[in-house]
A protein has these predicted regions:
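Glycine-rich FAD pyrophosphate-binding loop
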Residues: 1-29
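Generic enzyme active-site microenvironment
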Residues: 6-7, 146, 277, 284
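N-terminal FAD cofactor-binding segment of flavoenzymes
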Residues: 22-66
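A general structural signal for well-ordered alpha-helical segments in protein cores
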Residues: 34-38, 90-94, 98, 169, ...
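Conserved FAD-binding catalytic core of PHBH/FMO-like flavoproteins
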Residues: 41, 130, 137-138, 143-249, ...
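FAD/FMN-dependent oxidoreductases across multiple families
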Residues: 223-317
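C-terminal helical "tail/cap" subdomain of flavin- and related membrane-associated enzymes
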Residues: 304-383
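Conserved N-terminal helical subregion
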Residues: 50-157, 165-170
């Protein structure tokens, strides 16, 4: 088997996982996992661990336009699936995945360890990558897989070219407790200031308390600053008002956080023996919660192509092997990115003709079940 070193800037500390600190403590960063991602975690043997901690499946999604009558409703029942997806706190996913590492004999975890420099060296007839850490350690490897996030140090050191732009919006995230139960529904309202999403949560694996939601609100910086400066009571009132009281009043909120929104895509996913995946390769607007799912599909595709290459007797950094990964993923990722970009611009436009067409289009699509259900299945990774 291949020898693998997992280098992480931060050593995962399970004592910092909000889930372990009480039922009413939540991680502000959550992911909406699709069926394809859930299947991957099941294959890895960690899905049972995730569900044993806590997560919340959702059977319906309601989307509507604040500036008119346009709305669309997606239902798991309509596409004959048990759910549309599952909301999971990122720290719970990390905890489950880290628990796997002890069972992998050919893997060594190097953390906390930060990469300072990257170079290519001659190794017989081949070339290898040499990583230098901040503490002066040197690591030599046949292939570097950069999965180090949106501000990837490896991508920068390897001088990958990217296309990127700032959305001039920020995402405000927090966790709230609502007056009315979410009933396992995800809610998304498009407002002139930016989309507001309520994603359902459960405080424990066996809980029936459906009054917790993770919120993601896309706002211009000035507006997000106003929201952060509000008192808890003011913010609760503002939030309930902007969701049109679909879940009644907001009864409690946790700490609010803000992070910038930026779209970025690497023009190539590999250079020499460096390969990018996940947010290091592409950063997408959180409009539909697809970022983590795209990254997981990257990981599944890359591991499949590496295994295929090894079976064929190829070097794992062979351009043929990495090229197959790039061809399979770059088009799919770009397609999803442009779809989200189109949605963003469509709902940002507030002129009367566009608003009228937008509302007509949403309501019309809601009545065409074949197209609507195909979109739902595609978003879930089923088609």
């Amino acid at each position: 088997p291949l020898r693998v070193a997992l280098v992480d800037r931060i050593l995962h500390d399970p004592t910092n996982v909000p889930y372990l600190q009480g039922e009413e403590k939540f991680d502000p960063r959550v992911s909406a996992l699709t069926t394809a991602s859930i299947n991957l975690f099941s294959d890895l043997g960690v899905w049972e661990s995730i569900t044993g901690m806590r997560c919340c499946s959702y059977q319906a999604m309601e989307v509507w336009d604040a500036e008119g009558t346009g709305q669309i409703h997606f239902s798991a029942e309509d596409i004959k699936q048990p759910s549309l997806g599952t909301i999971v706190e990122n720290s719970i996913v990390n905890t489950a995945l880290y628990s796997l590492l002890n069972n992998i004999e050919n893997l060594e975890l190097l953390a906390p360890l930060e990469i300072e420099d990257l170079s290519t060296i001659q190794y017989g007839d081949d070339f290898r990558a040499k990583l230098t850490t901040k503490d002066g350690r040197e690591l030599t490897t046949t292939l570097v897989v950069a999965a180090d996030g949106t501000n990837s140090r490896i991508r920068s050191l390897a001088q990958f070219k990217t296309r990127e732009w700032d959305y001039e919006h920020q995402a405000l995230v927090t966790t709230v407790r609502t007056e009315l139960p979410h009933e396992h529904r995800a809610l998304q309202r498009f407002i002139d200031t930016g989309p507001l999403a309520f994603l359902p949560l459960l405080p424990a694996a066996d809980s029936e308390d459906e009054r917790y939601c993770s919120i993601v609100w896309s706002l211009v910086p000035e507006r997000s600053r106003e929201m952060l400066e509000m008192t808890a009571q003011q913010f609760k009132i503002e939030l309930a008002l902007n969701l049109e009281h679909k879940l009644g009043n907001i009864e409690a909120i946790e700490q609010r956080f803000v992070f910038p929104l930026r779209q970025r895509h690497a023009t190539d996913y590999f250079r020499g023996n460096i390969v990018l995946m996940g947010d290091a390769a592409h950063t997408i607007h959180p409009l539909a919660g697809q970022g983590v799912n795209l990254g997981l599909l990257d990981a599944a595709t890359l591991s499949g192509e590496l295994a295929r290459g090894v079976q064929a007797g190829r070097n794992i950094a062979d351009p043929i092997v990495l090229g197959r990964y790039q061809r399979k993923r770059i088009g799919h990722n770009l397609g999803m990115m442009w779809l989200m970009e189109g949605f963003k611009h469509l709902f940002a436009e507030q002129t009367l003709p566009v608003r009228w067409l937008r509302n007509m289009g949403m309501s019309g699509l809601d009545n065409i079940s074949v197209i609507k259900n195909h979109l739902a299945r595609r978003a879930m990774g089923l088609d």
